[in-house]
Swiss-Prot record:
Organism, scientific name: Syntrophus aciditrophicus (strain SB)
CC per GO annotation: cytosol
Lineage: Bacteria, Pseudomonadati, Thermodesulfobacteriota, Syntrophia, Syntrophales
Annotated GO biological process: alanyl-tRNA aminoacylation; negative regulation of DNA-templated transcription
Record protein name field: Alanine--tRNA ligase
Main function: Catalyzes the attachment of alanine to tRNA(Ala) in a two-step reaction: alanine is first activated by ATP to form Ala-AMP and then transferred to the acceptor end of tRNA(Ala). Also edits incorrectly charged Ser-tRNA(Ala) and Gly-tRNA(Ala) via its editing domain.
Gene responsible for this protein: alaS
């Protein structure tokens, strides 16, 4: 009997290979070309286009073990993880699929054969459900599989009818259920298959996609019905191994053992501890796989879900007594258990570990402070007899301390409290509105309906500017002016010109559009920019500098060659830099944006931390070494599928056509790219990285220059060095040493100044003490002093308080057109007088506000001329 999780996984795939299925590897957790999904959450996701008839995969039967995440979005199990035996954020789904090949009879027969003969589950424990109107499936189960009629249950559309959407492919489904026995679940005598307890476990769902539903709800039979099945590996392992929880299987045993060693909390001894142990075990798998598939923690989208999962695990670690980062230490355990099935994890082990550690450290910085505030709020609510954490508190924890809302809800759950979700959303909307008001960007321009109209009329442009072509002849097919079609453009008029064929590159993929001229008989049009509003349309934007251009005119198109060559050099350099970065820093580097101009290049990429200077130097040196090798830059046009098999780097989420250009630079770089490039790497000349920065969570940017601009940059830097060296009267090569000495001298002098200030303050404080007056038995000292900043004023006040021993002090100073006030109350008087209350009453005298503790408070205001009046006000208060 097969029991081990790894054996079940392999036996399933091998079984269906024996039934003529192609074994298909798991797809990424990031759904390809499907913006409707946050994560891959089922085995059928990667086959969606095959089911819709939009893709021919070359096989009609498939079997897979798909990694899935259900957290965030429509399918969200996050808040239940840890509290139940079955919920997971990450799990593996076994599935077999038919694209217009076999149907119900085979799907049912093979499912039954696998469970009863391969896994050897007892037949008497298995139940099935069918859609209430699916007589065909009912007969197959009853007559061919010989399942007793009392163990075949007909259910309605809600339970047993699957739909891809409101319209489109749909069909009935049949679920195979395992009865764990009377000793499991609610224990009620009337317990049945639809009871919410744990007795009856759904193991396998067989979906028979046989209809097309229209907007009126009418079902039309599909010409080629499909099969889509799904079975959770973790759940099947629990049944096969005879345990009551997925977490008790061998799939989780190594992780739980490792967590128990780290925390000193054995699994199975204390239910509260067990919840946290299960949370950490599940989340350790999720974060490893999500990061491995290229997702980084951030405050939006998939990155935010990852952050929520990771921080929830960190918080449960704290409940188990872990006050230091620990989750990253579980990465090797996850990878060791999964490396045979997902070998790419092994290559990314170091990277995944670093990302997790970095995020743990960030959260640890704010976790304690946030927990303290939340605990104070919980105590306050309990005293008040209320049970809901206000939305503004939830928002503050989210905005200031990085607590996702579900983490806050999870924490207060133990105190039987809930959070005000609506109040939180209102606070979020206020913040969004402020952001909208302060945003000055123009946003993405909508594609003009005019371009769409031209396209439907059959007007298109073929780009002929690859392979260094900068000249071509063509014919004007359309002229536009102020978003209107015109028949001609006259001298001095601005507009857009469209031709049948052009060597001008229209801005797309980060490469800017070309400039140049378009010339006809007694007509010259200056091209100031070239755009690509549609895939098949290129627009030349500019003005007529001579004559008149008309629709139908024959023209000669001349690209500004120097600018094009410089742009090409920067584009090719971007490819080299990406390849160099992958070599130096790891294959997790993925392009998330770029800009290529004639002057410079900008490359945005996924990475979790600042690139150190030595790493930048390695990247630059490696790229320049490839330039010196003068490798040929070869471009091939291939079908997309064939191109992807070559291992060429592709931009994630980029929409590619059926055929793509593959740009190869020797053995160093290979990318899918539709832009223009130089002929050999030596044409780039030289790359110089000039800046590296963070532009968003998990996204960084490199800026660089090449060729002549790189030389100009080096020359500017050299001139600045010479200028600084001349001022300091040293050689440029000794400049660093000289600056270090100057900084040390400055620090020494600053220390000396502080020492002198302290001595003067001590002397002044001794002199001022004689001015203290006794009012109602309390020594009160008020004085205007010479303090250039708040720190000096505080230092001076501390010395006065130490010497006064008992009393109230109010001192003030004028600096940079403002008044500063400091109030101090010695500890023996803080039960009668509060420095904070005193300063709040006096601050308005100088036009300001203030506050602080009972023993010390400060204020500032824009009316220094009222300082003396403010100081006298203290005596009146006492």
């Amino acid at each position: 009997m097969i029991k081990a999780g790894s054996e079940i996984r392999e036996s399933f795939l091998r079984f269906f290979e024996g039934k003529g299925h192609t074994r298909v590897s798991s797809s990424s957790l990031i759904p390809k070309d499907d913006p409707t999904l946050l994560f891959t959450n089922a085995g059928m996701v990667q086959f969606k286009n095959a089911f819709l008839g939009l893709e021919d995969r070359g096989y009609s039967r498939a079997a897979s073990c798909q990694k899935c995440v259900r957290a965030g979005g429509k399918h969200n199990d996050l808040e239940n993880v840890g509290f139940t035996a079955r919920h997971h954020t990450f799990f593996e789904m076994l599935g077999n699929f038919s694209f217009g090949d076999y149907f119900k009879r085979e799907a049912i027969a093979w499912a039954w054969e696998y469970l009863t003969e391969v896994i050897q589950l007892p037949k008497e424990r298995l139940w099935v459900t069918v859609f209430q109107d699916d007589d065909e499936a009912y007969r197959i189960w009853l007559e061919e599989m010989r399942i007793p009629a009392d163990r075949i249950v007909r259910l309605g559309e809600k339970s047993n009818f699957w739909m891809m959407g409101e319209t489109g492919p749909c069909g009935p489904c049949s679920e195979i259920i395992y009865d764990q026995g009377e000793g499991t679940g609610c224990g009620r005598p009337d317990c049945h298959i639809e009871c919410g307890c744990d007795r009856y476990l759904e193991i396998w769902n067989l979906v028979f996609t046989q209809f097309d539903r229209d907007e009126a709800g009418i079902l039309t039979p599909l010409p080629k019905p499909n099969i889509d099945t799904g079975m959770g590996l973790e759940r099947l392992a629990a049944v096969a191994q005879g345990v009551k929880s997925n977490y008790d299987t061998d799939l989780f045993a190594p992780l739980l053992a490792a967590i128990s060693r780290t925390t000193g909390k054995p699994y199975g001894k204390n239910e509260e501890d067990d919840v946290s142990l299960r949370v950490i075990a599940d989340h350790a798998r999720s974060v490893a796989f999500l990061i491995g598939d290229g997702i980084l923690p951030s405050n939006e989208g998939r990155g935010y879900v990852l952050r929520r999962i990771l921080r929830r695990a960190a918080r449960h670690g704290k409940l188990l007594g872990l006050n230091q980062p620990f989750l990253h230490e579980l990465t090797p355990v996850v990878i060791e258990a999964m490396k045979e099935t997902y070998p790419d994890l092994l290559d990314k082990k170091s990277y995944i570990t670093k990302v997790i550690l970095n995020e743990e450290q960030r959260f640890m910085e704010t976790l304690d402070a946030g927990l303290k505030i939340l605990q104070e709020e919980v105590s306050r609510l309990k005293k008040a007899g209320t049970t809901t954490i206000p939305g503004d508190v939830v928002f503050r924890l989210y905005d200031t301390f990085g607590f996702p809302t579900d983490l806050t809800a999870d924490i207060v759950r133990r105190d039987n409290l809930t959070i005000d979700e609506d109040g939180f959303q209102r606070a979020m909307e206020v913040q969004r509105e402020k952001a909208r008001e302060s945003w000055k960007g123009s946003g993405e321009e909508a594609i003009s309906a005019l371009y769409q109209k031209l396209s439907t009329q059959g007007i298109s442009t073929v780009f002929v500017g690859h392979e260094g072509v900068c000249n071509a002849q063509s014919q004007i097919t359309a002229l536009l002016q102020k978003e209107e079609l015109v028949d001609s453009l006259a001298e001095g008029e601005e507009g857009e010109l469209i031709v049948a064929e052009t060597p001008f590159y229209g801005e797309i993929g980060g490469q800017i559009g070309d400039t140049g001229t378009i010339e006809g008989e007694d007509f010259v049009f200056e091209v100031l920019d070239t755009r690509r509003p549609l895939d098949n349309l290129i627009s030349h934007v500019g003005r007529v500098i001579k004559g008149r251009g008309r629709k139908g005119d024959s023209v000669n198109l001349i690209v500004a060659e120097d600018k094009r060559r410089a742009t090409e050099a920067n584009h090719s350099a971007t490819h080299l830099l990406q390849a160099a970065m992958k070599t130096v820093m790891g294959n997790h580097i993925k392009q998330s944006g770029s800009l290529v101009t004639a002057e410079r290049l900008r490359f945005d990429f996924t990475h979790f931390s600042k690139i150190e200077e030595n790493e930048l130097e390695q990247i630059e040196n490696l790229a320049n070494a490839v330039i010196r090798r003068n490798l040929p830059v070869v471009t091939r046009v291939l079908p997309l599928e064939e191109a992807m098999k070559t291992g060429a780097t592709a931009v994630f989420d980029e929409k590619y056509g059926e055929k793509v250009r593959v740009v190869r630079m020797g053995d160093f770089s290979m990318e899918l790219c539709g832009g223009t490039h130089i002929q050999r790497t030596g044409d780039i000349g030289f790359i110089k990285i000039i800046h590296e920065s963070a532009i968003a969570a998990g996204v960084r940017r490199i800026e660089a220059v090449t060729g002549r601009e790189a030389v100009n940059h080096a020359r500017r830097v050299e001139n600045e060095l010479k200028k600084a060296a001349k001022l300091l009267k040293v050689s440029p090569f000794d400049l660093g040493e000289r600056v270090e000495k100057l900084i040390k001298t400055q620090k020494d002098q600053e220390k000396e100044i502080e020492t002198l200030k302290g001595r003067l303050a001590a002397k002044d404080s001794a002199d001022l003490l004689s001015q203290a007056r006794e009012i109602r038995g309390i020594r009160v000292l008020t004085a205007a002093v010479n303090a250039p900043d708040a720190k000096t004023l505080r230092d001076f006040g501390d010395k006065l308080r130490d010497r006064l021993q008992s009393g109230i002090i109010l001192i003030g100073s004028k600096a940079e057109g403002k008044a500063m006030l400091l109030c101090l109350v010695t500890k023996d008087l803080t039960d009668r007088y509060s420095a904070g209350s005193i300063i709040r009453e006096i601050a308005p005298v100088v036009g300001g506000k203030g506050g602080g503790r009972p023993d010390m408070a400060q204020a500032g205001g824009p009316e220094p001329e009222n300082l003396e009046r403010a100081l006298k006000h203290l005596e009146e208060m006492i």
